[in-house]
């Protein structure tokens, strides 16, 4: 019982999937009151013979990060102190570093990175293209109301293609010639009856989906030529592109849309639901009820889980594959105001980022619900959108008229190792 009070010892096995940091798989007797700090000291002493001392680790006990004393963690999990405990250790993900601040003339409500380019959308109705080194390339007028979402369709050495959506009820397709730095509107996509809040391009870049305040989900062609229109002329000559499909089911605004695969999408809404749509059936495949309006949602192709951002300051984790559709897998505490935006890493299975009205971005590990890995500070007003499409950069836009660019800590270390 002494260990339960943080006094006595606990038998543990230290395990890792990173073989170069492995220690002998034998029981170790450690004090029940240890935290991550003491475990790091203990583990680094064991690793001295491998020349790996000085490495910072995080520790997983029953699939959750240790964030306090070991005895408190075990008590919370109702784990017997008499049993040998497996503790998994992983090299700590390095802290992202602030790299740049991109100044705009109005709120930045949409950001999306692709390679060395950053696409931004603003409340002054303009789209902007920047390099990830902070050089402004182009300001693009066209919409007649604030931009709400942007996404890249394709990118090569000569051209970039992207889509933007706006409170003006339209989506617009664009083609940018990189060499001449000239942009052309390929099509104006009309069909929504209220502002278009969300957009996502399909994995094959042939279609894109939009979600609107009119509660409708619409699917559009992303091709330069849309044969259904009977012409391949540009919008200056041919006018409007119409949706390929309209799907109804939400009762309030669709705030998030993402392709899960070539025929499946997930949407999040202010109506407190996540819906998974089957485009082949042209209907809802799964519905997950939540207890709060959803401002954003992100699906991970690596772990097949969905994380949501809501008005109650929390993020929540769901599994659309389970029959228990209303059960939350985890709740993440740390923001102090509405959480407006969230996105999974597309290379790190357990990591995601969020941005909030509390002016902060946070980097999370989904196995650490009690605290984020890092706070990413810099914005002076509420954060409106965050993006981690480029694994090397976390990019966010806010009501302080700036885009903040953070370099991934892992990218920083890789650069140092190659010098």
From Swiss-Prot:
Family: Belongs to the WD repeat WDR12/YTM1 family.
UniProt repeat feature WD, residue ranges: 103-140, 142-184, 191-230, 249-287, 289-328, 334-374, 378-416
InterPro entries in the record: G-protein_beta_WD-40_rep, NLE, WD40/YVTN_repeat-like_dom_sf, WD40_repeat_CS, WD40_repeat_dom_sf, WD40_rpt, WDR12/Ytm1
Record has Cell membrane as a keyword: no
Record bears the keyword rRNA processing: yes
Secretion signal, residue range per the UniProt entry: none
Entry-linked PROSITE patterns: WD_REPEATS_1, WD_REPEATS_2, WD_REPEATS_REGION
Main location: nucleus
Coiled-coil parts of chain: none
GO cellular component, one term: PeBoW complex
Protein name: Ribosome biogenesis protein WDR12 homolog
Span list, region Ubiquitin-like (UBL) domain: 10-91
Taxonomy, superkingdom: Eukaryota
UniProtKB keywords: Nucleus, Repeat, Ribosome biogenesis, rRNA processing, WD repeat
Pfam families the record matches: NLE (PF08154), WD40 (PF00400)
GO MF annotations in UniProt: ribonucleoprotein complex binding
Annotated organism of origin: Drosophila virilis
Described purpose of this protein according to its UniProt entry: Required for maturation of ribosomal RNAs and formation of the large ribosomal subunit.
Localization terms from the record: Nucleus, Nucleolus; Nucleus, Nucleoplasm
BP terms from Gene Ontology: maturation of 5.8S rRNA from tricistronic rRNA transcript (SSU-rRNA, 5.8S rRNA, LSU-rRNA); maturation of LSU-rRNA from tricistronic rRNA transcript (SSU-rRNA, 5.8S rRNA, LSU-rRNA)
């Amino acid at each position: 019982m002494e260990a339960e009070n943080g006094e006595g010892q606990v038998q543990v096995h230290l395990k890792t999937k990173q073989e170069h940091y492995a220690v002998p798989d034998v029981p170790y007797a450690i004090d029940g009151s240890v935290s991550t700090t003491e475990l790091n000291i203990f583990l680094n002493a064991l690793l001295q013979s491998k020349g790996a001392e000085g490495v910072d680790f995080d520790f997983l006990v029953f699939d959750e990060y240790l964030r306090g004393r070991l005895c408190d963690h075990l008590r919370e999990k109702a784990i017997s102190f008499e049993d040998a405990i497996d503790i998994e250790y992983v090299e700590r993900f390095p802290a992202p570093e602030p790299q740049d601040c991109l100044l705009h003339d109005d709120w930045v409500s949409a950001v999306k990175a692709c390679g060395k380019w950053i696409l931004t959308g603003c409340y002054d109705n303009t789209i902007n293209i920047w390099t990830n080194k902070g050089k402004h390339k182009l300001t693009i007028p066209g919409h007649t109301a604030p931009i709400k979402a942007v996404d890249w369709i394709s990118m090569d050495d000569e051209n970039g293609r992207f889509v933007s959506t706006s409170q003006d009820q339209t989506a617009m397709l664009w083609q940018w010639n990189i060499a001449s730095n000239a942009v052309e509107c390929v099509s104006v996509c009309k069909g929504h009856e209220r502002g278009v809040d969300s957009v996502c391009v399909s994995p094959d870049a042939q279609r894109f989906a939009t979600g609107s305040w009119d509660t409708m989900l619409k699917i559009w062609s992303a091709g330069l030529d849309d044969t259904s229109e009977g012409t391949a002329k540009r919008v200056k000559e041919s006018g409007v592109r119409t949706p390929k499909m309209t799907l109804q089911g939400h009762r309030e605004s669709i705030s998030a849309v993402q392709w899960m695969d070539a025929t499946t999408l997930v949407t999040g809404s202010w109506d407190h639901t996540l819906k998974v749509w089957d485009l082949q059936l042209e209907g809802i495949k799964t519905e997950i009820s939540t207890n709060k309006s959803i401002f954003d949602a992100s699906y991970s192709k690596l772990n097949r889980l969905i994380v949501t951002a809501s008005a109650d300051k929390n993020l929540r984790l769901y599994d659309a594959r389970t029959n228990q559709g209303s059960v939350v897998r985890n709740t993440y505490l740390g923001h102090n105001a509405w959480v407006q935006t969230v996105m999974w890493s597309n290379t790190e299975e357990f990591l995601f980022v969020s941005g909030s009205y509390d002016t902060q971005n946070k980097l999370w590990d989904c196995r650490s619900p009690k605290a984020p890995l890092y706070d990413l500070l810099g914005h002076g007003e509420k954060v409106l959108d965050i993006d981690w499409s480029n694994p090397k950069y976390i990019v966010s836009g806010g009501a302080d008229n700036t885009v903040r660019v953070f370099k991934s800590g892992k990218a920083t270390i890789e650069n140092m190792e190659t010098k």
